Regions:
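Short amphipathic alpha-helix with an adjacent loop that forms part of the alpha/beta core around
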Residues: 33-36, 191
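Short beta-strand motif preference
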Residues: 22-24, 41, 85
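Flexible, active-site-proximal loop/turn residues at the rims of small-molecule/cofactor binding pockets
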Residues: 31, 48-49, 91, 160
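Short, conserved, GDST-rich strand-edge loop motifs in beta-rich repeat architectures
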Residues: 51-64
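Non-catalytic accessory segments flanking enzyme active sites
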Residues: 1-34, 72-75, 79, 117
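Active-site-proximal cap/loop segments of hydrolase catalytic domains
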Residues: 63-196
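Serine-hydrolase catalytic-loop signature spanning alpha/beta hydrolases and amidase-signature enzymes
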Residues: 49-51, 84
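Short beta-strand element of the alpha/beta-hydrolase
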Residues: 28, 36-49
Length: 196
């Protein structure tokens, strides 16, 4: 665990294609230097809903706190030579009545911007990135794996992947399945599985 206490942490900010400000904490192994080759990475996030871009763009993390690890923390991957893009802001902006109509586009744009920002500073290899999350973050990870080519692998812990099984709403979705069946189907990554 001493290695994990010395994780290098850095707040990175960037913008997604629609101009929304994003931030994430770049976690690197204690002995990593900028002269070394880019690392494989894990992007770990949990999407959150916002009514406006200004609120969504606020930086919420800090490098001035202790590394706390519990259970099967994704930060253990740093000790194995991975970069971890942690506390990634993954905002879904819109009215509570219809924010999920653009959920896939918004999280895809956020993921692409964060990967590009970390790659541009030489920290990660954009061809070797995994995505992960827990609960709603797991749903996000499965959705990104189903709808983008940004990731090579994923960790989806305890998520809901078939929204037709939550017909009376989920997260901040207020419409029922019967009011917005196309949204429920689109947001069911289980129905988008591809085999190769």
């Amino acid at each position: 665990e001493p290695v994990l206490r010395r994780i290098q942490r850095r707040i990175i900010t960037c913008r997604r294609s629609d101009g929304v400000e994003l931030s994430f904490t770049l976690c690197l192994p204690a002995d990593h230097s900028p002269q070394q080759p880019p690392l494989p990475a894990l992007l770990w996030a949990y999407p959150r809903e916002f009514n406006d871009p200004e609120t969504a763009g606020q930086v919420s993390g800090s490098v001035n706190r202790f590394n706390t690890l519990a259970g099967a923390s994704h930060l253990f991957l740093v000790s194995l030579g991975y970069a971890v893009l942690d506390e990634v802001s993954m905002p879904v902006i819109g009215s509570p009545a219809d924010a999920n109509d653009s959920f896939i586009r918004q999280i895809s744009d956020s993921a692409a911007a964060v990967i590009q920002a970390a790659a541009e500073i030489g920290a990660i290899d954009p061809a070797r990135v995994a995505v992960g999350g827990h609960s709603y973050g797991a749903f996000m990870a499965a959705t990104l794996l189903a709808h983008t080519d940004l990731f090579r692998a994923g960790i989806a812990r305890s998520g809901a992947y078939n929204r037709t099984l939550t017909p009376f709403g989920f997260q901040n979705e207020r419409r029922t399945f019967w009011e917005a069946p196309e949204v429920y189907m689109q947001l069911s990554p289980r129905s988008e599985e591809h085999t190769s």
